[in-house]
Swiss-Prot record:
Listed name of the protein: Leucyl/phenylalanyl-tRNA--protein transferase
Gene that specifies this protein: aat
Matches recorded under HAMAP family: Leu_Phe_trans (MF_00688)
Keyword Acyltransferase recorded: yes
Enzyme Commission number(s) from the entry: 2.3.2.6
Known function: Functions in the N-end rule pathway of protein degradation where it conjugates Leu, Phe and, less efficiently, Met from aminoacyl-tRNAs to the N-termini of proteins containing an N-terminal arginine or lysine.
Reactions mediated catalytically: N-terminal L-lysyl-[protein] + L-leucyl-tRNA(Leu) = N-terminal L-leucyl-L-lysyl-[protein] + tRNA(Leu) + H(+); N-terminal L-arginyl-[protein] + L-leucyl-tRNA(Leu) = N-terminal L-leucyl-L-arginyl-[protein] + tRNA(Leu) + H(+); L-phenylalanyl-tRNA(Phe) + an N-terminal L-alpha-aminoacyl-[protein] = an N-terminal L-phenylalanyl-L-alpha-aminoacyl-[protein] + tRNA(Phe)
GO molecular function, one term: leucyl-tRNA--protein transferase activity
Protein family: Belongs to the L/F-transferase family.
Keyword Acyltransferase recorded: yes
Membrane-crossing segments per the record: none
Length: 222
């Protein structure tokens, strides 16, 4: 399926050693969806052109392979409230000020605007963790086929982002989703069960999961 029939990205296999595939262009919702459907994602700093990446290797998390440590097991027993798609703009704004990627603010105002539009279109989703009325953790990403493309997480109390990821994995497993794309390998995510695969394997898995219809709309849990 072509999400943006007016634009085609280069073959991901032609990216450089760091995974950089293309530079420039306008960050529109349709173009972002087209990128994800080809195993590509935007990542750039404010004031710079849009950079499009398809790294090799890739990091993914199979929903039923999430690892729960002893400390996290204790945290999961706390009376958090878990919600989906009730505070997308707050989650992405928190993520923008609590960046996971080398402590740099990479979630630009342009990205916030585009991903908010994708949320309104039913493609971008947020998972929220509440301690009473306070939003203490969460994550957001894109859903296509039976895959969830994680973008960023945040927490204001210890392990709240891990609670959000565990919450995401539970929901993805119940919906028979195939994998969560974690993009770049990190020791933190690997300690939670994420694994490294080749770009070739990732692209194959991606094409298989895109055979399923997109689960669009405002998500909810019963």
């Amino acid at each position: 399926m072509a999400y943006d029939s007016n634009y085609t990205f280069p073959d991901p296999e032609t990216s450089d050693k760091q995974g950089l595939l293309a530079i420039g262009g306008v960050l529109t919702p349709k173009r972002v969806l087209q990128a994800y459907s080809q195993g590509i994602f935007p990542w750039y700093e404010p004031g710079n052109p849009v950079l499009w990446w398809s790294p090799n290797p890739r990091l993914i998390l199979i929903p039923n392979e999430f690892k729960i440590s002893r400390s996290l097991k204790k945290t999961l027993k706390k009376p958090f409230k878990l919600t989906v798609d009730t505070a997308f703009q707050r989650v992405i704004s928190y993520c923008a000020t609590c960046s996971d990627r080398s402590n740099k603010t990479w979630i630009t105002s342009e990205m916030i605007e585009t991903y908010t539009q994708l949320h309104e279109m039913g493609y971008a989703h947020s998972f929220e963790i509440w301690d009473g009325s306070e939003l203490v953790g969460g994550l957001y990403g894109i859903s296509l086929g039976h895959a969830f493309f994680g973008e960023s997480m945040f927490h204001t109390i210890t392990d709240a982002s891990k609670v959000a990821l565990h919450f995401l994995c539970r929901i993805m497993q119940s919906w028979n989703f195939d994998f969560i794309d974690c993009q770049l390998p990190t020791l933190h995510l690997m300690s939670l069960g994420a694994k490294i695969i080749s770009r070739k394997e990732f692209l194959h898995m991606l094409q298989e999961t895109l055979k399923y219809p997109d689960k669009k709309g405002n998500w909810s849990i019963d």
